[in-house]
Amino acid sequence: DEMVKARFVEMFGDPVSNPYDWNLKGLLQLGDCKNGMNFHSTDAGVNIHCLGVGDFKNLSCISDTSKLPTVSLTDIPSDEYMLKDGDIVFVRSNGNKALVGRSLVVYPATTPTTFSGFCIRFRLNSDEVKADYLLRVLKTDSIRKKMAGRGANIQNLNQKILGELQIPVPPLDLQNRFASFVEQTEKTKTTISHSLDKLETLKKALMQEYFG
């Protein structure tokens, strides 16, 4: 992520100081927000994957929501509560205030996935910005401080706070170049991770062979 952060600053500068003087748009001019669902322990009938605060960790992207936990509901949620590819989800409320305001992008594809009431979903409805670019804007320290206002941490995130955020809108070709860089970086990380897993498996096999 440090490589991605450095590349972002190099290409776009800090989104609050906006050194390249990009055109600014309010976040809610670019899409809409929806608070997540509140579930009840007595609900039953439909099991569905659900993104909760505990799933955020230090992730920037979840591309396989079938690995998320499931919740039981009485009915399938309406479309506005179902996550779609490119949705950005924020932590809205949490006992650990440092987690509030964290965000990630999801790509559930065909896996039906909802999100908990402790989250806010943002859905782009503008073709002026790409999800990968917007996510990195929202994860910068300066934008997180804007969310927090005068406090060190955000007490609770709400749609009013999000609506006050001003997002620089650079040219799409620049955003696409950044998205390609992010994609290549993720592929490299995945390749390295798989290689390390194979080495660990080989090491265990050799240890078993030599030492029983």
Question: Can you say where each PLM-predicted feature lies in the sequence?
Answer:
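Sequence-specific dsDNA recognition surfaces
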Residues: 28-40, 54-87
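A short glycine-rich beta-alpha junction/loop motif
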Residues: 38, 111-120, 129-132, 151-176
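Short, solvent-exposed loop/turn positions at domain surfaces
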Residues: 76-77, 151, 190
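Short coil/turn segments at secondary-structure boundaries
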Residues: 20-23, 40-47, 65-66, 149-151
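Non-catalytic DNA-recognition/assembly elements of restriction-modification systems
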Residues: 2-37, 164-176, 184-206, 210-212
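A short beta-sheet element
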Residues: 52, 79-139, 158
